[in-house]
Design a protein with these regions (language model features):
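Acceptor-binding helix/loop patch of EC 2.4 sugar-transfer enzymes
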Residues: 9, 69-82, 130-141
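Short linear interaction motif-like sites in intrinsically disordered regions of transcription factors
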Residues: 24-26, 77, 91, 126
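Short catalytic/ligand-binding loop motif for oxyanion handling, primarily in non-cytosolic enzymes
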Residues: 14-15, 44-46, 71-72, 117-121, ...
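Short, well-structured alpha-helical segments in soluble
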Residues: 93-105
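An aromatic- and histidine-rich active-site surface loop
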Residues: 86-95, 109-141
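N-terminal subdomain of nucleotide-sugar transferases
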Residues: 1-58, 103-105, 128-131
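A conserved catalytic-core segment of Leloir-type glycosyltransferases
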Residues: 36-92
């Protein structure tokens, strides 16, 4: 079974759009892989409630990298320039968390899942000796 780190800023079992997309990728990958999912903390309660109801829930390990309510509200408005500032900071902390996970777990692949704009690749690509998957990728030029 492959062990995968997934970076999914927005991930929720009860939503559509980015959070729902990430959740659906994760629940389907977890049928075949062991996942270590780093996500923001907004949907923690919903995630923790849903996991025990899924047969593949035992293959889904969540690590939360929460932001303040003020930053969270700002980040939902991605047109705000501050979104990019705080999202980059969040991505750097996620990179540090991923390195800690790799030090403790056998990880085969890294997946940069969302947010899915080509302008925000995160920092997980800096991790050496691990293949990285980035996408799906959206955005317009």
């Amino acid at each position: 079974m492959l062990n995968i780190i997934i970076n999914a800023y927005a991930c929720s079992p009860n939503m559509g759009s980015e959070p729902g997309m990430a959740w659906n990728w994760c629940i389907n990958l977890a049928k075949h892989c062991e996942l270590h999912i780093i996500t923001e903390g907004e949907f923690k309660e919903k995630i923790e409630t849903a996991l025990p109801t899924l047969p593949q829930g035992k293959n889904m390990h969540f690590y939360y990298n929460p932001v303040s309510d003020e930053i969270r509200k700002m980040c939902w408005n991605q047109g705000d320039w501050r979104f990019y500032k705080y999202y980059k900071q969040w991505q750097w902390k996620t990179y540090e968390m991923a390195k800690d996970i790799i030090a403790k777990q056998k990880i085969d692949i890294i997946h940069q899942l969302n947010m899915i704009g080509f302008r925000e690749p995160g920092y997980l690509w800096k991790i050496e000796n691990k293949p990285i998957v980035w996408g799906p990728i959206g955005g317009k030029i």
